[in-house]
Amino acid sequence: MPSKLQFYSEFAERTARQITGSYRSWTAFLATAARLYKYPYNEQLMIYAQRPNATACAEYDFWKDRMGRYVQRGSTGIALIDTSGYQPRLRYVFDVADTAPRDAARSFTLWEMRAEHEAKVCSMLTEQYDVPQDGGIIAQFERVADKLALEYWTEQKRDICGIVADSFLNGYDEDNIRMAFKTAASTSITYALMARCGFSPDGYFEPEDFMPVFDFNTPAAVSVLGTAVSEISQRVLRQIEITVKRQERERRAERTEEHGEQPDLQDQRRISGPRPEPARESA
């Protein structure tokens, strides 16, 4: 009988083989990964496989000690494979939906990018990545994703070219591998940014936009692609988070100063329904 570690290792490998098998599978993974953007790819994969609708995950002690929340009876932890030590081991996290607040619990909210944040986010993206603002924020997301995907390829192309064996990339020359990787990564990053920032990427992209993703059809190949998408998305989303939260703090401070109101600690709401996005520009 396999150990739990072996069971979950094989489970992760099966999931990795499946997620690039179709447009729906890959974008479903991206939607989960976008919500859990602070986790690395391998842990995003495990969370997606066990709890695809998870929104915010943390270990038991974090919920109990830092947030003043308790894990509800009967909740099942999400198993993650921890490779940070000398030997792999399992650790478990719980989604916020598995928890409930104690009397002295800290307020728990997820940041949300709303229409009033877009101007500052656009300015931040221009400053950080030297991309123009014309065409709106979705066009900016695409430009940032294109730029960072190409930078990632330049830095990691030896490793990327080293995983083509047994995948549909096998037989491609370096230039075609570069094109496949850049397109797959850039499209996926843009999808993740849109999903986390409240837009509807499924209404923006066509399944054909993800065709290069399907070439990454082995665990090693999807790991390279997934790691790139995860690392780049995390970098950009952390900067967006900082920008949004800073604007909210400034707005609350102004309200308090002008009207003598107490800061609204609950103003950052959970993400509601996605906002409509601008029409996609034709090529």
Give the location of each predicted region.
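N-terminal accessory/interface modules of nucleic-acid-binding and processing proteins
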Residues: M1-A283
